[in-house]
Swiss-Prot record:
GO BP: intracellular protein transport; positive regulation of insulin secretion; vesicle transport along actin filament
Subunit details: Binds RAB27A that has been activated by GTP-binding via its N-terminus. Binds MYO5A, MYO7A and F-actin. Interacts with PRKAR2A. Interacts with components of the exocyst complex, including EXOC3 and EXOC4.
Pfam families, alphabetized: FYVE_2, Rab_eff_C
Region (Actin-binding) residue spans: 495-856
Segments of skewed composition (Low complexity): 427-437, 450-460
Recorded GO MF terms: actin binding; myosin binding; protein kinase A binding; small GTPase binding; zinc ion binding
Keyword Repeat: yes
Modified residues (Phosphoserine): 299, 351
Name the UniProt record assigns to this protein: Rab effector MyRIP
GO cellular component: actin cytoskeleton; dense core granule; exocyst; melanosome; perinuclear region of cytoplasm; photoreceptor outer segment; synapse; transport vesicle
Tissue specificity field: Detected in brain, skin, heart, lung, adrenal medulla, pancreas, intestine, liver, kidney, skeletal muscle and testis. Detected in cochlear and vestibular hair cells in the inner ear, and in photoreceptor and pigment epithelium cells in the retina.
Compositionally biased tracts (Polar residues): 551-574, 613-625, 784-793, 826-840
Length: 856
């Protein structure tokens, strides 16, 4: 696979011997490919059979997956394959000593196929080098044969194919290879090379994206590249061709500056277009007069050229000639344009189709070459052999994709300040600048059909784009506040808004990002409507030129059409382009607004705050504001969910306490309750600590359950988004994560049940939990003596914040002591007081009224 292969020095016998070797190599390759294809087919059938049989669990446990023979003790023992993980018999597998595992026969064949097919070689080397080995030798010999036989006469260029010793399939990273190829080849060969290189680049991008299987964004990128592979290939090939053509034109201009040929002047006032298409022998192709592309292809007419020639009869200075060369450099052409100088016109010969012209010389007649699409049989045979279309079918044609939106939007954008200060040019000035009146007239068919690939500095481009302005004029915004709004974003080819800093949105949910951008744009517009309407009556000095621009758009359309773009400075051009991008962004946002619902409009209108919104906010600050709003919404939702879960757990706990206390009765109000005293033998501090610890455990358990539920929901969403090509190992990892999360949820539920059992044990032991006192916030002595019931503590719990963070949960759970309770602490005292004490305790247990039993 060397860079060069020169076989020009071989004799006929040596060439014949090389051809025999190449033919034998091709035959061997074909046989090997047939054998590998049969092996692949057998493996595919075996895999399909295994996929069907593996669904039956009993068959997998009792029979061999390969030969379907049943397993028997000591006679036909089963063994587990190390690759496919299926159970196979002894006859269907072999032991690999270096790997220390059993491998079935099918997996061995798969390994052999991967080794013999050289997949790594074809994926990494052959995709980059299309022609190497025998194919490269054969191509070189064929080129040599064509050179010797003389059958390689270039139909299009009029020269011979020069032998290209470079590897045409190499993409070493430089475009010099393609430039060298295009010098000695026809444009058809150059286009074929560009298409092949573009296809290889797209395939390499797809393979790189597919290598990152764990990233959802890379998978989406790979699918997009596969779906739009043909369009992207054509676009990239066009870019490569433009670079090749630009370099060829630069070389031609340099040669023209060095030679500076003198062309005879035409003193006649009119030149008739004639269809004298003559042919010349091959020996005349070195004539000094070369063909030039017609003026109609660049929106020039013969009348305009003659007018400009008669107006400027004196020869131009070298500075004007250099300026003309710079203007011509921006025009797409397959041939040099040095001879199309308006001051030095010669008698012309026009082709029958009107697309190509040549200079007429009295002594020598130049050969006529029509560079439109040829119809000869040789050219068509070359097209079929190279499996590509002609370069002239697509290059230089008017299409919807080539339409320059920035130039078309100049009709909708106000002119620059420097343009307003210039007086309106007279028709004579417009003609002297090299642009005739027919070049900008909408009724001129030549101007309407001009090339869409000319530079933005040419006023003929504006005339060519007028036919496409109707759609953009219908979509133009009618709100002046919207027209004045400064937007900091830019647009790519697909009308995707991007930040000014160059950061692209790479989120996995493009619809959500689009809705966020739409809502933000609507808030900006509504916030700026009020201030701008108030400032409209008293315009500031800074806003006066902008309003003046808006008022004079309709009056200055003709002025901008005939003005010369080269007279404006760089700064004015940059400002116009920035305004065009902003206007195009406004159009895209207005089109997307029509698809939103009225409910979202009302919601965004109610939340709009004009005093906080400013037109000079950068895109980064706006993105930060949107992220903060999303965080607040998410925190509010999570706080609501946490509060709901905590209240459910607390209410369930209180319900268990109420049920364990027995049927409710309305006991008489005791004097101790009226005085705010606890029953005899009740340790107030101890009961409060116990209830506080129980509530903390409830909060921790509820927070753990909520966090685990969130993890489960995230795992479920990730499982739904998994691509169909996800491997078995990734699925197994996800299943392990789900099982671990489920185990944690089960553990949290066990903790909750343990807390409930402890509460019931406390109730059965005789502890009166209802008349406890909250000791969390004691600010004065009066609050300490107040008795709080379950009803009042429930109201306080509703005001509690969200449970602590995960670190605090772990610390609290590790520090929480284990409470031990004495069942006989009420039996302290004399034996005579025991019945009385037990009776009083029973009454205290029945004291909570019926209102606290209602669970809500």
């Amino acid at each position: 696979m060397g860079r060069k292969l020169d076989l020009s020095g071989l004799t006929d016998d040596e060439t014949e011997h090389v051809l025999q070797v190449v033919q034998r190599d091709f035959n061997l390759r074909k046989k090997e490919e047939d054998r590998l294809s049969e092996m692949k087919q057998r493996l595919a059938e075996e895999n399909s059979k295994c996929s069907i049989l593996s669904k039956h669990q009993k068959f997998v446990e009792r029979c061999c997956m390969r030969c379907c023979s049943p397993f028997t003790f000591l006679v036909n023992a089963r063994r587990r394959c190390g690759e496919c993980k299926f159970s196979v018999c002894k006859s269907c597998c072999s032991y690999q000593k270096h790997e220390k595992l059993w491998v079935c026969c099918v997996c061995q064949q798969a390994r052999l196929l991967r080794t013999q097919s050289l997949e790594w070689f074809y994926n990494n080397v052959k995709s980059r080098f299309k022609r190497f080995g025998s194919a490269k030798v054969l191509k070189n010999l064929y080129r040599k044969h064509r050179l010797e036989s003389g059958a390689c006469f270039d139909i299009l260029g009029g020269g011979l194919f020069e032998p290209n010793l470079e590897n045409e399939g190499s993409i070493s990273g430089s475009d010099s290879t393609f430039y060298r190829q295009s010098e000695g080849h026809s444009m058809m060969d150059t286009l074929a090379v560009a298409l092949r290189v573009a296809e290889e680049a797209i395939e390499e991008a797809i393979s790189k994206a597919e290598s990152h299987g764990d990233s959802l964004d890379k998978q989406n990128e790979a699918s997009y590249l596969r779906d739009h592979k043909q369009e992207l290939t054509e676009e990239l090939a066009g870019t490569i061709l433009q670079r090749i053509i630009r370099k060829q034109k630069d070389k031609a201009e340099l040669r023209a500056e060095e030679e500076e040929p003198e062309w005879p002047r035409s003193q006649s006032g009119s030149v008739k277009a004639r269809g004298e298409g003559t042919t010349a022998p091959p020996g005349r192709h070195k004539a000094r007069a070369t063909f030039r592309r017609s003026q109609s292809a660049f929106s020039f007419t013969m009348e305009d050229a003659l007018k400009s020639g008669s107006a400027e009869a004196a020869p131009r200075s070298p500075k004007d000639r250099a300026q003309r060369l710079l203007e011509e450099a921006a025009l797409p052409s397959w041939r040099s344009m040095d001879g199309l100088d308006g001051t030095n016109l010669a008698p012309l010969l026009q082709s029958p189709d009107g697309n190509w012209m040549t200079l007429k010389d009295g002594s020598r007649q130049p050969p006529t070459r029509l560079l439109t699409k040829p119809k000869s049989g040789t050219f068509q045979a070359l097209e079929v052999a190279s499996s590509v279309t002609s370069a002239y079918d697509e290059i230089g044609s008017d299409s919807e994709e080539d339409f320059d939106y920035s130039e078309a939007l100049s009709k909708l954008c106000p002119p620059s300040q420097s343009r307003l200060k210039q007086p309106q040019p007279q028709p004579t000035q417009a003609q002297s600048s090299g642009q005739g009146p027919l070049a900008t007239s909408p009724s001129n068919p030549e101007a309407m059909c001009s090339d869409s690939e000319t530079s933005s500095t040419s006023s003929s481009r504006e005339a060519g784009c007028r036919a496409k302005l109707s759609w953009l004029q219908r979509k133009a915004p009618k709100n002046p506040a919207v027209e004045k709004m400064p937007l900091q974003g830019e647009l790519d080819v697909n009308f995707n808004p991007q930040a000014a800093g160059g950061e692209t949105s790479d989120s996995s949910d493009p619809e959500e990002t689009l809705r966020t951008a739409e809502r933000r744009a609507r808030r900006w517009r509504r916030a700026r409507v009020g201030p701008e309407e108030s400032n409209r009556g008293l315009p500031s000095p800074g806003a006066h030129p902008r309003a003046l621009h808006t008022a004079q758009v309709s009056d200055n359309v003709s002025e901008t059409d005939i003005s010369n773009e080269t007279q404006n400075s760089r700064s004015s051009t940059d400002s116009v382009e920035e305004k065009l991008r902003n206007r195009l962004y406004e159009l895209a946002m207005k089109m997307s607004e029509k698809e939103t619902s009225s409910g979202e409009d009302q919601e965004s209108e109610s939340k709009a705050e004009p005093k906080n919104q400013k037109g000079s906010l950068s895109s980064e600050e706006n993105n930060q504001g949107v992220q903060e709003e999303l965080k607040k919404k998410c925190s509010a939702v999570s706080l609501c969910n946490i509060s709901t879960e905590v209240l459910k757990v607390i209410n369930a706990t209180e319900e268990l306490i109420a049920e364990s206390a027995g049927p409710w009765e309305i006991p008489p109000v005791s004097t101790d309750r009226e005085n705010g005293m606890f029953p005899l033998g009740t340790d107030q501090v101890r009961l409060d600590k116990q209830l506080t610890s129980l509530e903390e455990n409830v909060y921790l358990a509820a927070g753990t359950v909520y966090g685990l539920e969130g993890q489960l929901s995230e795992l479920e969403d990730a499982a739904r988004c998994i691509h169909s090509s996800t491997g078995e190992t990734e699925l197994a990892d996800l299943e392990d994560q789900v099982a671990a999360a489920a185990a944690q949820v089960h553990h949290a539920e066990l903790q909750i049940s343990d807390i409930e059992s402890r509460i019931s044990a406390l109730t059965i032991a005789g502890l009166n939990i209802a008349p406890c006192v909250r000791l969390t916030r004691r600010r004065d002595q009066k609050q300490r003596s107040q008795v709080q019931t379950i009803d009042t503590s429930r109201q306080q719990r509703r005001k509690l914040p969200a449970p602590p963070v995960k670190a605090e949960k772990i610390e609290a759970s590790s520090v929480t002591p284990i409470k031990t309770f004495n069942r006989n602490f009420l039996l302290q005292g004399s034996s005579t007081n025991r019945p009385t004490a037990s009776t009083g305790d029973t009454k205290d247990l029945m004291e909570p009224d019926l209102e606290s039993a209602v669970m809500y």
